[in-house]
Regions:
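Accessory beta-strand-rich segments of carbohydrate-active enzymes
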Residues: 1-103, 123, 262, 267-269, ...
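Short strand-edge motifs at loop-to-beta-strand transitions and within beta-strands
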Residues: 41-45, 151, 158-164
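Short beta-strand edge segments in extracellular beta-sheet folds
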Residues: 94, 150, 202-206
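Active-site mouth of glycoside hydrolases
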Residues: 35, 39-44, 70-72, 84, ...
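Extracellular interdomain linker/stem segments of modular secreted and single-pass surface proteins
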Residues: 96-99, 205-211
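Beta-strand-rich binding/interaction modules
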Residues: 25-27, 113-153
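Extracellular and select intracellular beta-sandwich modules with Ser/Thr-enriched
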Residues: 87, 143-145, 195-200
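Extracellular recognition modules
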Residues: 60-62, 183-187
Length: 288
């Protein structure tokens, strides 16, 4: 693969969305990092120092179908599942500034309150994170409870994790009958006032609560859970699925008058998007 000289001074990461199951990654004959174990979730390596700018670069991936980790092998290989191996989800590169948002988690409740936990890479002191929300349906900006279009979080320390909170007005909560969705945008502004990174994700404002001897509540209303178990599986692709297959499965489940799905492991992101769009609640059995 080609790496242009214009990438100089930036961080380059390679992402794997799913490799079954132990993976050793080499860039130009050198290890990208420790062997990755676990076949169902995304992982990445910072390969900046291994690249040859302005030249051809070589990626090698060595995959073992059986894991050297006994616990992982028991979870992935000893159950009554079809056994597959290889790179079965997308692989891509991301070019990032030296200081960037590495990972973030959003929690948006049905009253419009939003909390963001953002992991920073590099010393972000002096930067700002700007958060905004718009409707997925019509693209209209959603105003905060004090009438602003954004919330600005100044980073006054060198802590890796930055916590941001805000409240948005007049939101329509997500529910199984009305799966209303929004887009949250996080922008990173450097001390010179330039936006150096933008991240977006779809969100639903919802509150899920569990009460012993009572059940599950969604947005303060008891939810009668009617669901099924589902494997990520394609007749002609094995573990490699598609957005079209995800939509077909989600529609079939919805047509069966169900509102919930339990997976055996993290599914493809496009299936979670379909669940969000159609009003299906989702639970993972194994986080990895």
């Amino acid at each position: 693969f080609d790496v242009p000289k214009s990438w100089a001074g930036q961080r380059v990461k390679i992402f794997f969305d799913g490799v079954m199951t132990d993976a050793e990654i080499m860039i130009n004959g050198k290890p990208a990092g420790e062997m990755h174990q676990g076949g169902f979730y995304r992982f990445n390596y910072d390969i900046t120092e291994l690249l040859n700018l302005g030249k051809k670069n070589q990626l090698e991936v060595k995959v073992a179908k059986e894991s050297a980790n006994r616990s992982i092998n028991a979870a992935e290989r000893k159950a009554d599942w079809w056994l597959f191996g290889g790179i079965y989800r997308p692989v891509w590169l991301e070019v990032l500034p030296q200081v960037h948002m590495e990972h973030f988690v959003l929690n948006a409740d049905h009253q419009g309150k939003l909390q963001a936990a953002v992991d920073m890479a590099g010393d972000a002191k002096g930067h700002e994170i700007i958060v905004s929300v718009r409707s997925l349906k019509d693209g209209k900006t959603v105003y905060t409870s004090n009438g602003q279009t954004t919330i600005t979080h100044p980073i006054n320390n060198s802590d890796k994790e930055q916590m941001i909170s805000g409240e948005w007005a007049s939101i329509i909560p997500w529910s199984t009958e009305n799966p209303n969705l929004y887009v949250a945008k996080l922008e990173l502004k450097n001390p010179e006032g330039k936006i150096v990174q933008t991240r977006e994700t779809r969100i639903g404002f919802r509150t899920v609560e569990f009460f012993p001897q009572d059940g599950v509540y969604l947005n303060g209303t008891k939810l009668v859970v009617k669901g099924i178990n589902r494997h990520s599986f394609s007749v002609d692709g094995g573990r490699t699925t598609s957005a079209a297959l995800s939509r077909m499965d989600a529609l079939l489940i919805k047509e069966m008058n169900m509102n919930a799905i339990r997976s055996h492991y993290p599914p493809d992101e496009h299936f979670l998007d379909m669940c969000d769009s159609l009003g299906l609640v989702y639970m993972d059995e194994l986080a990895g």
